[in-house]
Amino acid sequence: MNYNNPTQLQAAILDWAGTVVDFGSFAPTQIFVEAFAEFDVQVSIEEARGPMGMGKWDHIRTLCDQPQVAERYRKVFGRTPTDDDVTAIYNRFMPLQIEKIAEHSALIPGALETIANLRQQGIKIGSCSGYPKQVMDKVVALAATNGYVADHVVATDEVPNGRPWPAQALANVIALGIDDVAACVKIDDTVPGILEGRRAGMWTVALICSGNALGLDYEGYRALGSDALASERKRIHALFEGSRPHYMIDTITDLPEVIADINKRLANGEMPQSS
């Protein structure tokens, strides 16, 4: 029995917020701010966006480890945040997130058409998120009412380690019956999500305008002038550079051209690990 390189993509593993739904990835960001505020600790939107893509407990832990946030917490409680404190914030975050997730559940413009295009090519649609299953169940149900149903969904608490570990992406590979990770592409708007795909041995595509890095809603994105947009693209490209995405595009609507290019590279014998 011999190994043969895959010659075309079999699966696309899509992130959720900032990739398929919730242009600008506002749902989790605003709730982090509100959850900390209930403990009388101020966290800015910009600070809350920093660790985006990680599981939500890990996200809160990372925020609490930032010196300025830890100092604000110390001024209120007389100590820096422990893991028990992180869990307390997380336990407040969860019901707030579930309560308000519907406010940011709209599909990103062009997502349905792009996903339909992938399926017409025989590409399966896997998905994963930094949300825990309790939140994902609601996100999935809301997306279904808008016409989007992924072939598989993996929440961050359904694997031993969430992003940037590769477990969620690999769980999709197993569930979808994909025979080679090199026949998969991971699409995400965060650095941890791109690292997840890289570590899983997949092709990776970073979305630079629809998600956390730009942090604007669709109308704000469309209103950017050409110079401002070029400046933001340059800034965000630099943010993603260290995670080594194979491609960087504005939104999911630009994905079909990338898929065609990956299939061409696979047909020529190129593998994601070699670039």
From Swiss-Prot:
Does the entry annotate any disulfide bonds, and if so which pairs?
none
Q: Record the organism.
A: Pseudomonas fluorescens (strain Pf0-1)
Q: Please give one Pfam family short name.
A: Hydrolase
Q: Which HAMAP family match?
A: PhnX
Q: What EC number(s) is this enzyme filed under?
A: 3.11.1.1
Q: Which cofactor does it need?
A: Mg(2+)
Catalytic activity entry: phosphonoacetaldehyde + H2O = acetaldehyde + phosphate + H(+)
The record describes its quaternary structure and partners as:
Homodimer.
Q: Which GO terms describe its molecular function?
A: magnesium ion binding; phosphoglycolate phosphatase activity; phosphonoacetaldehyde hydrolase activity
Query: Could you say which enzyme class this protein belongs to?
Result: hydrolase
The UniProt entry's GO CC annotations, sorted and at most eight, read: cytosol
Active-site residues? 15, 56
Q: Which GO terms describe its biological process?
A: DNA repair; organic phosphonate catabolic process
Q: This chain belongs to which protein, by name?
A: Phosphonoacetaldehyde hydrolase
Q: Which domain of life is it from?
A: Bacteria
Keyword match Metal-binding: yes
Per the similarity annotation, which family is this? Belongs to the HAD-like hydrolase superfamily. PhnX family.
Chain's role: Involved in phosphonate degradation.
